[in-house]
Swiss-Prot record:
Modification sites for Phosphothreonine: 248
Assembly description: Interacts (via phosphorylated form and BSD domain) with AKT1; this interaction is enhanced in a mTORC2-mediated manner in response to epidermal growth factor (EGF) stimulation and activates AKT1.
Source domain of life: Eukaryota
Post-translational modification: Phosphorylated. Phosphorylation increases in a mTORC2-mediated manner in response to epidermal growth factor (EGF) stimulation.
GO biological process, one term: cellular response to insulin-like growth factor stimulus
Tissue expression summary: Expressed in heart, placenta, lung, liver, skeletal muscle, kidney and pancreas.
InterPro entries on file: BSD_dom (IPR005607), BSD_dom_sf (IPR035925), BSD_domain-containing (IPR051494)
Protein name: Synapse-associated protein 1
Cellular component per GO, a single term: extracellular exosome
Subcellular location: Cytoplasm, Perinuclear region; Golgi apparatus; Perikaryon; Cell projection, Axon
Residue ranges of every copy of the BSD domain listed in the record: 158-210
Keywords: Cell membrane, Cell projection, Cytoplasm, Differentiation, Golgi apparatus, Membrane, Phosphoprotein, Postsynaptic cell membrane, Synapse
Organism: Homo sapiens (Human)
Function: Plays a role in adipocyte differentiation by promoting mTORC2-mediated phosphorylation of AKT1 at 'Ser-473' after growth factor stimulation.
């Protein structure tokens, strides 16, 4: 066995031809020495092998530790760079979401969404509880037919307070009620206008429609109240009007007074006959003209009496104003009559 091992290690060369070695060859070493040297060589080879394996394992551990350290360093540096970049850009929501503050914000957001849901359930269209719901509803629904109602901002200087969060539930209700509004929103937002601006312009025009309806209703109420007060005042003033109003038309009384004054003036004038007809005969005036003038006077008096009767059906204020005008007219007519009488007297005096 040792011989085969020594031959494997190259310690002994076989002799060619199986002959005896030459006489000059050194004497053969003892087998025990060969075995010991072989064992030493095997031990040295095993030690070297173990040393080599230990070196390889140490190198492997060193390389692994170096690679792990490098990866950890790179990961820490990358994380630090990401945090720095997020802080600079303000995108720290992802980091905050992983903390207690993030959990609190999630709960708060959930609570706000629940409140929005409750408001949406309680929200109603803008035309509810108005005076004329049907008319206002038609006018509001007609706004969705023209996109200018959503693109044009309120005029400059107009104070229109719009809270998007507060009106958001109403907007959701209107999207359900008005299909054309939903299509208009899909076509305009966000291509031509922002979401908040879209609803601001829309609800501004809705408020104009509601204000117009309120003003119309208020004007109608004031008009009805004024008519009622007027009728009540007329009923209250009716007894006083009956007491103050003369039993006979004022024109008739004035005509009688005017006749008496004419008679007095004619009777006191010198050289004048007792009656006006005598005076006309004395002057040789045209009887036809005189008759026409008298008829005209009668017609004028009848017209005045008819006007007075028509004025009796008007209200008290108009009657008072009309009576004042009649007094002025009578005064002017009296002045004309006086001038006419003076002319007659002058003519009679010239004839005499």
């Amino acid at each position: 066995m040792f011989r085969g091992l020594s031959s494997w290690l190259g310690l002994q060369q076989p002799v060619a031809g199986g002959g005896q070695p030459n006489g000059d060859a050194p004497p053969e070493q003892p087998s025990e020495t060969v075995a010991e040297s072989a064992e030493e060589e095997l031990q040295q080879a095993g030690d070297q092998e173990l040393l080599h394996q230990a070196k390889d394992f140490g190198n492997y551990l060193f390389n692994f530790a170096s690679a792990a350290t490098k990866k950890i360093t790179e990961s820490v540096a990358e994380t630090a760079q990401t945090i720095k970049k997020s802080v600079e850009e303000g995108k720290i929501d992802g980091i905050i979401d992983k903390t207690i503050i993030g959990d609190f914000q999630k709960e708060q957001k959930k609570f706000v969404e629940e409140q929005h849901t409750k408001k949406s359930e309680a929200a109603v269209p803008p035309w509810v509880d108005t005076n004329d719901e049907e008319t206002i509803q038609q006018q509001i629904l007609a706004l969705s037919a023209d996109k200018r109602n959503f693109l044009r901002d309120p005029p400059a200087g107009v104070q229109f307070n719009f809270d998007f969060d507060q009106m958001y539930p109403v907007a959701l209700v209107m999207l359900q009620e008005d299909e054309l509004l939903s299509k208009m929103r899909f076509a305009l937002v966000p291509k031509l206008v922002k979401e908040e601006v879209f609803w601001r312009n829309y609800f501004y025009r809705v408020s104009l429609i509601k204000q117009s309806a309120q003003l119309t209703a208020l004007a109608a109420q004031q008009q009805a109240a004024g008519k009622e007060e007027k009728s009540n005042g007329r009923e209250q003033d009716l007894p006083l009007a009956e007491a103050v109003r003369p039993k006979t038309p004022p024109v008739v009384i004035k005509s009688q007074l005017k006749t008496q004054e004419d008679e007095e003036e004619i009777s006191t004038s010198p050289g004048v006959s007792e009656f006006v007809s005598d005076a006309f005969d004395a002057c040789n005036l045209n009887q036809e003209d005189l008759r026409k003038e008298m008829e005209q006077l009668v017609l004028d008096k009848k017209q005045e009496e008819t006007a007075v009767l028509e004025e009796d059906s008007a209200d008290w204020e108009k009657e008072l104003q009309q009576e004042l005008q009649e007094y002025e007219v009578v005064t002017e007519s009296e002045k004309r009559d006086e001038n006419w009488d003076k002319e007659i007297e002058k003519m009679l005096q010239e004839e005499n």
